[in-house]
Amino acid sequence: MIILASHSPRRQELLKRIVPDFESHPASINERALPVLDPPAYVQSLATAKGQSLVPSYPGATIIAADTMVAFQGKLLGKPHDRAEAKQMITALGGQTHQVYTGLWVRLDNGSVRQQVVTTDVTFWPLSEADVESYLAEDAYQDKAGAYGIQDAGALLVKSIQGDFYNVMGLPSSTLYRMLLAEPQ
């Protein structure tokens, strides 16, 4: 049995490409209770907490947990609370390079645990006020770290990426695939 510690439609879609048969169960953790560390350490601690919270309910299962955050100039950009916050984020990212971090935590059915943080650099085009307003009108910023989804209207903001495209979507598939292999890495 494989458990994905998330109800994210994007993560489910990406995991189906690797593992066609799994169950999705969100982890119930208090993210605010965890100390905010540097971005890579923070996403790893969140993924670990999510995964570990499901171990008692699924002791013999393979559990996959992930957490993705956007960081710009050392500051974490989570999901915007409203349109105004999304506008601030997108405006700040215009013409700049930022990082997308995903912490992965995998507990295999044999009990071994694997962890990894994947980083992707994303560069946005310079954005005019009209560009930002046009993007915000799509409402594609909702429920997205950094106020954009590269698989949606946010793709029009992106000039280039360096690293794993699927990491920006929330689940670095090729890295996860290798973590799921039975052999040590």
From Swiss-Prot:
User: Which coarse location class applies to the principal site listed for this UniProt protein?
Assistant: cytoplasm
Q: Gene3D superfamilies from the entry?
A: 3.90.950.10
UniProt cross-references to Pfam families, sorted A to Z: Maf
Reactions performed catalytically: dTTP + H2O = dTMP + diphosphate + H(+); UTP + H2O = UMP + diphosphate + H(+)
According to its UniProt record, the EC number is 3.6.1.9
Task: Tell me the CDD domains matching this sequence.
Answer: Maf (cd00555)
Compartments, as annotated in UniProt: Cytoplasm
Q: Which NCBIfam families match?
A: maf
Family indicated by similarity: Belongs to the Maf family. YhdE subfamily.
Q: Its function?
A: Nucleoside triphosphate pyrophosphatase that hydrolyzes dTTP and UTP. May have a dual role in cell division arrest and in preventing the incorporation of modified nucleotides into cellular nucleic acids.
Instruction: Identify this protein by name.
Output: dTTP/UTP pyrophosphatase
Q: What organism is recorded for this protein? A: Lacticaseibacillus paracasei (strain ATCC 334 / BCRC 17002 / CCUG 31169 / CIP 107868 / KCTC 3260 / NRRL B-441) (Lactobacillus paracasei)
Lineage of the native species? Bacteria, Bacillati, Bacillota, Bacilli, Lactobacillales
